[in-house]
Amino acid sequence: MSDLPIEFTELVDLMSLGISPQFLDFRSTTFESDHFVTVRETKDGTNSVAIVDLAKGNEVTRKNMGGDSAIMHPSQMVISVRANGTIVQIFNLETKSKLKSFTLDEPVIFWRWLSETTLGFVTARSILTSNVFDGNVNAKPQLLTLRHANLNNTQIINFVANKNLDWFAVVGILQENGRIAGRIQLFSKQRNISQAIDGHVAIFTNILLEGNGSTPVQVFVTGNRNATTGAGELRIIEIDHDASLPSQYQKETTDIFFPPDATNDFPIAVQVSEKYGIIYLLTKYGFIHLYELETGTNLFVNRITAESVFTAAPYNHENGIACINKKGQVLAVEISTSQIVPYILNKLSNVALALIVATRGGLPGADDLFQKQFESLLLQNDYQNAAKVAASSTSLRNQNTINRLKNIQAPPGAISPILLYFSTLLDKGKLNKEETIELARPVLQQDRKQLFEKWLKEDKLECSEELGDIVKPFDTTLALACYLRAGAHAKVISCLAELQQFEKIIPYCQKVGYQPNFLVLISSLIRSSPDRASEFAVSLLQNPETASQIDIEKIADLFFSQNHIQQGTSLLLDALKGDTPDQGHLQTRVLEVNLLHAPQVADAILGNNIFSHYDKPTIASLSEKAGLYQRALENYTDIKDIKRCVVHTNALPIDWLVGYFGKLNVEQSLACLKALMDNNIQANIQTVVQVATKFSDLIGPSTLIKLFEDYNATEGLYYYLASLVNLTEDKDVVYKYIEAAAKMKQYREIERIVKDNNVYDPERVKNFLKDANLEDQLPLVIVCDRFDFVHEMILYLYKSQNLKFIETYVQQVNPSKTAQVVGALLDMDCDEAFIQSLLQSVLGQVPINELTTEVEKRNRLKILLPFLEQSLSQGIQDQAVYNALAKIYIDSNNSPEKFLKENDQYDTLDVGHYCEKRDPYLAYIAYEKGQNDDDLIRITNENSMYKYQARYLLERSDLDLWNKVLNQENIHRRQLIDSVISVGIPELTDPEPVSLTVQAFMTNGLKLELIELLEKIILEPSPFNENVALQGLLLLSAIKYEPTKVSSYIEKLDNYDADEIAPLCIEHDLKEEAFEIYDKHEMYGKALKVLIEDIMSLDRAASYADKINTPELWSQIGTAQLDGLRIPDAIESYIKAEDPSNYENVIDIAEQAGKYEELIPFLLMARKTLKEPKIDGALILAYAELNKIHEIENLLAGSNVANLDHVGDKLFENKEYKAARLCYSAVSNYSKLASTLVYLGDYQAAVDTARKASNIKVWKLVNDACIEKKEFKLAQICGLNLIVHAEELDELVERYESNGYFEELISLFEAGLGLERAHMGMFTELAILYSKYEPDKTFEHLKLFWSRINIPKVIRAVEQAHLWSELVFLYAHYDEWDNAALTLIEKSTKDLDHAYFKEVVVKVSNLEIYYKAINFYVKFHPSLLVDLLTSLTPRLDIPRTVKIFSKSDNLPLIKPFLINVLPKNNSVVNQAYHDLMIEEEDYKALQDAVDSYDKFDQLGLASRLESHKLIFFKKIGALLYRRNKKWAKSLSILKEEKLWKDAIETAAISQDPKVVEALLTYFVETGNREGFVALLYAAYNLVRIEFVLEISWMNSLEDYIKPFEISIKKEQNDSIKKITEELAKKSGSNEEHKDGQPLMLMNSAMNVQPTGF
């Protein structure tokens, strides 16, 4: 496929990422761009969204989501979620922020991102847009327009807009004429009008037309397939035409090709690549169409997927299209930039179109055409068009073309070709480096900087340092822009400094990683602007990359030395932010300078705790001198210094001073407090109190109290303790506070403390208050009240005659304690008048119950009578009042019975207990009123008051109470029962108590007593003789306890419920009595039921029915006979009753018993009144059983309501096929009719009927029958309808194969491949069948349909069939390159396709296969080995490979390979190559290798070569020794082989005089005068003059050393002359500093004192 004009890629398989196929559809999966795929999933009732990030290696992120739809932003991690159709929320997943949250008025049907910022919505009536990033979270979308009527009843599938968001199109599809039709609503925002268009897809795009310069034309592209004719059409029209443009786009219309078998296919997506001018149109069935945008020419059509596509998005910056099919494959298509132009030239033979495409996109493939056209136009002197052609071709955009066009003179009045060339390029895009430089010079020279700047801003120029150099003389700022774009860092820094934009230097250096000389920059800035210099230095410090490059001490010294204290301080404050110990001297320095020159600054520095490592004693002393006592105290540690400073309270903030004591220990704190009090106690007492209050826990309250007491500071003590008393747990502290408050006469405070405080010792405080005898006794009253010293308090107050405080206590403090006060006063024999007066003053506030208790203890109740009566008159309804009055009336015998009966307010229990010993009857009255059951029963039993008890029980009518008194353990039960029967019952007229009494008797097992009671009530004259309930109860009791009396009771009694009594009789086996009751009350049906079900005599029942002779009884007896399986009798009874209502049971039982003959009359009777399917169905079944087919035909021909499907099924089960056929035919049930025809042997009719049924199960049945009868043509018809269902394939194939019908099976699948519903399983199964039975056809089938088969399944089949070529083909197309390569190695020893093997093996993932392949080639294909190794080199472990061949002694086989990999300079490769060259005695190649590549054991190789027989190798060994500075070894070999030139070079290279002198000596000794002279020349600088003179004198070589001597003399003279000149210059003038060096000033040079650093 390398020559195709498209590149086809599978981006990801969503199912392989865990996405369930059930969610791969248009509603659940959204695809806004080639960045994200979003899938909404539901699992276990929980919604989640899976986000597949295609740009991050298909990373899957899952998030819980409560919504029903979600889409991702095209490029950002922004997700939009929709819930309930109307609620929309948009989140940024990276920042975890909410961008939008709103609720629409109607549900969103479709939504899509229209741009990077705008989201579009389509509802049932409206089209809306929302700017997601406008910052307004709650803003609702804006209404764009209303939906057009042409979108009614459509499914919205797309919403698009142009770049300016002023044209919009909404696309919908619907079913029409059996096809999918498309509708488009085109809307113009500016004109506010909509237009309805037919179409399935739409998109807006731009195109540059020839002659319009760089201004594009807007076009609207639509694709449509006519629902009526099926014809496809692509339309391209211009919108918003600009009349000022010379060229106008002409409307283009092109046919869209659809294959004949794709009748239901339609366009589903369209994308346009503006860069290349290509339209991509994708159809539902996976066909991709390519069109050229300007001409509308169809370029290419192919199918990219066999599965249907449901969504698509732009791909690769909108230069391609991506889509998702139903199997979850994300597929992408874009043009092949290298093949599209050749394809148009070669396949379409359209040269003009090829040039258009190549020109627009700058694509290769038409370079020769451009070159020829360019040359032709030049020859024709058509320079303008030649320039345009050159600008249109990337291959012609070079310096040669520029030079040629520059040298052409334009005709008069015409634009020069070079300017036309540049203008064309600028219209189309960006100039390259050479073009920019060529254009810049003339433009700037003509002073057209604005034009140049315009091009620069539009990014039309490629910037370089050379361009900046050209621009700088004209405009430094413009040059800076060029340098910035070109990355010329040094030039950028220079320009920024020249423009004084210092603040931009550091950010730029950080950005580009450039390091300038900061000291020089800072020095220059200090001179011009100290503030800016300080800011610049601070910025350097704040940058971790530059902070380490500067010396902060030197910089600070520069500031301070020039008296820039503020700037130097600011710098050091930033520099010393770390506050580390090593910065201590600098911290001290900053503080010293500022304490001397700016104390306020020093105060602020110390106050902010910026430093902690300075010299604190020194700074403290300076602070004290400067009057900064606070700072001095913060740094002093000696108590003497602290006490000296701390007394300056007027200069110290009080809050700080108080807090300062927290830094002192207890002893120091006390010393300072004493110093403050000694200095000026009046002025400092407030401070002392605050300190004592804050640090009370630390110093101790006792110590502080003693301190205050020692100085007699009562007021201070009071205020100090006031701060503690509410929080302390110390009793002594509270006591001291009460004492101090008493001295200060703060009685209200004492009152507050004793009232609210819970810590003090009440006994101690009470005694203190009694002894203090305060003017106000209220604190004492409160203490005694709180801690229950009331009695003692009353005694103290009564004795001291403080009666007003007694009244105050009762009236104001605690009226609830009045009872105790009264008791105490009574104990003191206080005057009753005072007591009564006291009580009258607190009327309504006294707890009367307690009061009466206290007074009752002292037998003085009568004293309360006036108080109680006054209380009642005041409306007090307290129960205790009535209790007390009752007791007083009882004791005084003042009409107590009347009071107890008439009054309801008293406590009946309390008063009753009070009366029990005085008068039991009064107690009975009280208990009866209060329904105090237990006490009433007790006193009536104790006092033999049984008749009162009986009356009370009957009146109460409480079953639980009855059960209690009737308990057999009650010794008084008999007397009570007698009283109830003799006295209680005769007095009653209400039946309810009687009934409850009876129930109580029954509950307590009083059987005989109950019957006795009931007989007396009912059988003797009483108001209850005719009571239904009691008569029933009597019968019930008799049934249970005296069954023999039941018959007599039935005769005597009439007023009872027969429906209740008769079932009880049956329950207790009194069946005849039950029959008598029913018969007596004329309940014939129930009487008959007793005969049938209980007495179980059907004959007696039949006689009874005959006697009564009603239809109801006949129906009832018929049902009983049916249940007893007397079927004929039952049917006869039903017929007599003319009752068909029980037809279901009659039919079921009769059919089970086979009584069809008897059943038919019943059914005919039933059909007269009922129209029931079961009746008609049963009649058909009965006729069928009796073989009355004619009657069935007559029945079916007439009116009937039978469920013929169900009846047919029953007949089919009973093998009554003829009758079944009649039923199925009558309802046109082709599925079952086909099955029936199969059993009737009519196969052709069965197939025809199965086609009408179109049911898999039917096709299978008919197919099985046809196969069994060898009706293969009919079987194939059935099979073709089965194989399109993948789940039926296995069973169908097994059926054919088990019968040996292989050819017929293959023929079936071959015929099925052309079906529209052909699926992967069919192609797969046919491939397997070919591999088994017709292997020759396998490869061809695989090559045609490899993309449509299940490759793993076919791999197993071809492997079993030993089809190795096919196996390799499948492995390769399944990307299992490892298996493909291994199969080729194992199975292709002879007929190996070397080129194909190389293509396969380079793609393997397991590199061990490389080495298997190498061994395979060594063994079978050694001549191709080097070519293989060359292909494998990029991933090959070369050392390992070389070792393999070294061990097997096969290095010569890979010599070219070794040469090829030598540049990698690997030691193993080098060693192997050396071995090979030594073996081949190729010294030249060896020399080149050791010179070029140094990674090998050089000394080891030298040692090997030293002993080689050839002198050339020995020379190489010597050179290796020389390279490793083994001079002696090297010279030894060279001297031995007389290689004098190399020896002289070696000695000179050594730079060692000893080596040189040794070789000189050797030359003298061996008489080699030429070598001696040559060495003197080569090593001239290494030889000592004295050594040369000596050896030449001793060996008479003076003439040979003359040149050497002359050179030495000349050097000496030159040196002397030079020294003389330098001395003369120094004596003439002093040496000056050189310009350009950094200014490094020392303290001494600036005449300043040492800074203390």
Swiss-Prot record:
Residues 453-469 are annotated as: Binding site for the uncoating ATPase, involved in lattice disassembly. There is a cross-link at residue 1107 (Glycyl lysine isopeptide (Lys-Gly) (interchain with G-Cter in ubiquitin)). Residues 108-152 are annotated as: WD40-like repeat 3. Its main location: membrane. Belongs to the clathrin heavy chain family. The gene is CHC1. Residues 199-263 are annotated as: WD40-like repeat 5. Gene3D superfamilies: 1.25.40.730, Clathrin heavy-chain terminal domain, Tetratricopeptide repeat domain. Pfam families: Clathrin (PF00637), Clathrin-link (PF09268), Clathrin_H_link (PF13838), Clathrin_propel (PF01394). CHCR repeats lie at residues 543-689, 692-834, 839-978, 985-1130, 1134-1275, 1280-1426, 1429-1572. Clathrin is the major protein of the polyhedral coat of coated pits and vesicles. In yeast, it is involved in the retention of proteins in an intracellular membrane compartment, presumably the trans-Golgi. Residues 23-66 are annotated as: WD40-like repeat 1. Keywords: Coated pit, Cytoplasmic vesicle, Isopeptide bond, Membrane, Repeat, Ubl conjugation. The C-terminal third of the heavy chains forms the hub of the triskelion. This region contains the trimerization domain and the light-chain binding domain involved in the assembly of the clathrin lattice. One of its GO terms (biological process) is intracellular protein transport. This is Clathrin heavy chain. It comes from Saccharomyces cerevisiae (strain ATCC 204508 / S288c) (Baker's yeast). It is found in: Cytoplasmic vesicle membrane; Membrane, Coated pit. Signal peptide: none annotated. It is a peripheral membrane protein.
